Structures are given as structure tokens and as C-alpha cells.
Amino acid sequence: MTKEQFAEVLAAQGISLTDRQKEQFDHFFRLLVEWNEKMNLTGITEEGQVYNKHFYDSITPAFYFPFDQVQSVVDIGGGAGFPSIPLKICFPHLKMTIIDSLNKRMSFLQHVAKELGLENVNPVHGRAEDRGQEAMYREKFDLVVARAVARLNLLSEFCLPFAKVGGHFVALKGAEITPELAEAKKAIKTLGGKTRKVETFQLLEEAGERNIVIMEKIEATPKSYPRKAGVPAKKPLV
């Protein structure tokens, strides 16, 4: 995918990039490749692949969810800034918090935000299980996003506690989502969520199937969730 094709496919979905936004994506690509040489951020570094499998993929939730109607967003397991940074570039009004357990990635994200001139980007070091119990973050966000971090029952425990009641959780998942949805049904309900819709589509250039799972937070998450760090992975809710 060329930079021009990237801009065209977004415009076809109603997201028209300004010259400044196009420059921000180009700068982000260069920073990603540069920093990837000293820390493991991504296995994808070829420009066309980055634009398709990282940038475009990160923005696809906006084809199905109204990002212009939310203010506060948290990206759980945001690592190299996906989906948070592409979404922030496209929707500059967002107040974006990025939580990741690797501190060195926080340095990268802080540098990216500064270099790209992105305001209201807050990288936070920590595990979702810990931060999700803290009053500063718990049930404070209009929207929670996460990209292929874990299976949906586990991911829901990491993410739903951060959403306000009436807010949403959007999970960016790969192929074969039906078994995960069935497996996660009880967990989602227990955590106060309800699956509203699932959108299935193909990434461009035969890069594979993707699924966007959109949940609404309809009840407060019980105080016992998320459980202590490491417990959800060992004993997933089923």
C-alpha cells in the first residue's frame, strides 16, 4: 500500500487527511523504523506493509464506530502505538492514554508524541490488571481500544474495567472470531459488558481477515475485577 493509496482508501471512508496529517504518518513511520533498530517494536518495517498492516489496520475501527463522538480513549497494551497513534493523528481531539507493561515503549511513545506535535497523549507504564483497579483510570474512559493482545475472554477482563458505564470497548481482532465470542460471552456479561456488533472484513492486498468487536459497558464492573496481575492469564473467565 502506497502513501497515496492509504490516503485514498481513508477518504473513501470519510476520513480526509490534511497535508499535516500525511506528514505525521510519514514521520511516525520513520521513527518506528529508527527506534525498532534498538528495541523490538515490530516485525514489520517495509513502508507499504506498515501503512497497510499497522496504520490502516489501526484506523479501521473508525469505519464502524463514531470516534468524533468520544473524547477520552485508552489503548490497552498499546506497545508501539497501535491503534492509538494512527487514531490520534486522524482524530486530533481525542485525549489518548496508552497503557503498556514495558517501560521502554513509553519512551518511544513520548518521543513520537513530541516529534509529531500530538497533544493530550499520555503513555502510562503498568499492567492493565493493576491500573484497572486504580481510581484514576477505572471507569474513566468513553472508549477502550485494544489490538490483538489476547483472547477475548482475557482481553475483556483487561479492558472493560476502564470503560465508563455507557462507554464502549472496541477490540481489533484477527480471523476466526466466532469461537472466541462464544468463549467470552460469560466473561463479558460478568464484567458489565454487552457485545453490540461484530464487523468482519479483509485487509487490503490479501493481508488477511480482521474482526472489529464493539461492546457497550452497560453495568459497573464488580470491584473484584480485574484480578491481580497474572491471575486472568492463568485462570481466564469462561
From Swiss-Prot:
Belongs to the methyltransferase superfamily. RNA methyltransferase RsmG family. Specifically methylates the N7 position of guanine in position 535 of 16S rRNA. Keywords: Cytoplasm, Methyltransferase, rRNA processing, S-adenosyl-L-methionine, Transferase. InterPro entries: rRNA_ssu_MeTfrase_G (IPR003682), SAM-dependent_MTases_sf (IPR029063). Its EC number is 2.1.1.-. The lineage of its organism: Bacteria, Bacillati, Bacillota, Bacilli, Bacillales. GO terms for cellular component: cytosol. One of its GO terms (molecular function) is rRNA (guanine-N7-)-methyltransferase activity. It is found in: Cytoplasm. S-adenosyl-L-methionine binds at G77, F82, A128, E129, R147. The keyword Metal-binding does not apply. It comes from Brevibacillus brevis (strain 47 / JCM 6285 / NBRC 100599). Its main location: cytoplasm. It holds the Pfam family GidB. This is Ribosomal RNA small subunit methyltransferase G.
